[in-house]
Amino acid sequence: MMRAYIDTNILVDLVFARKEFLPDAQHIFALGYANEVQLVVSALSFVNTIYLGRKYKYPMDEVYSKLRLIADFVDVADLSGQNVVDVLNSGWNDYEDATQHHSAIEEQADCIVTRNKKDFKASLITVLTPKEFFEQMGSK
């Protein structure tokens, strides 16, 4: 089964129901829920989503509720001290993107799914937009 590492922007689209991007995010997570693909989401993505919820004054009980539901069927990737050190020495300009990339590799993901492919130009694994992901899955 394919292991797809989900970037923070896709998780945020789902949790905050971002109108323009919500259908793709819903479809990605529905595929994971149906066990058609194994989704991997970083602990950092959960933290970033909670931070954004507070920053933009979303009802936090709803944010936590949605994240708990998601955590029930995705693999949550841990961040280790070694991950932090490796990313600091990686040479990437964006620490958060480098952390996601390194975590995806550690989790043996087949791809990273993101709306911002340009953030992963130096990726050692395949990076897909949601549309490309659906094409690869033969879905939508």
Over which residues does each language-model region extend?
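Short, well-structured N-terminal submotif of metal-dependent ribonuclease cores
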Residues: 1-41, 56-61, 122, 131-140
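Residue-level preference for alpha-helix termini and adjacent loops
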Residues: 9-15, 73-78, 94, 119, ...
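Residues in flexible loops and secondary-structure boundaries
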Residues: 19-23, 78, 84-87, 95, ...
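Acidic, PIN/NYN-like endoribonuclease modules and their adjacent C-terminal/linker elements
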Residues: 3, 73, 102-140
